[in-house]
Amino acid sequence: SVLKREIYDLGYDISKVEDGKVTFIGDADAIARANIFLRTAERVLLKVGEFKATTFTELFDNTKELEWEEFIPKNGKFWVTKANSINSKLFSSSDIQSIVKKAIVERLKVKYAVNWFEEDGNSYPIRVSLMKDVVTISLDTSGDSLHKRGYRPAAGKAPISETLAAALIMLTPWKS
């Protein structure tokens, strides 16, 4: 894939390639560099955990077991921005979002010894993906999609997205 080549060009090794997703291992610098330099990615996600869940109880318990305190500070503002489910027993996006948020709150209540979160600090958007009963929970490090990089605050309708256009150009022999 074009994105795979872009990641290699940044100096990172690919650990997995799937439909619509390329996984690589890197540090905090890699996250920043990926958000700045990847032209064909829609967003850069930091995987917090992956586990199997066929019931909402399993989803809650496994989410609560993840070390959220490593990623979200005591005053962090967090919410589940998106949940999607494909070929999984758990399919209600709103229920998945609610249960994941509740599990994170319960974990952080214990770790930070508080009963209430002000959530007045930095934002930590969370994305949940279920594929064949395997849950992947990630922090969204990009915020808005990467095709909205600030150079054009209001984009008009286009026949293709900027990231797809970048990929098509990268597949041609043309060099800037």
Indicate where each model-derived feature is located.
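Non-catalytic nucleic-acid substrate-recognition regions in nucleic-acid-modifying enzymes
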Residues: 1-124
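Glycine-rich adenosyl-nucleotide cofactor-binding module
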Residues: 130-176
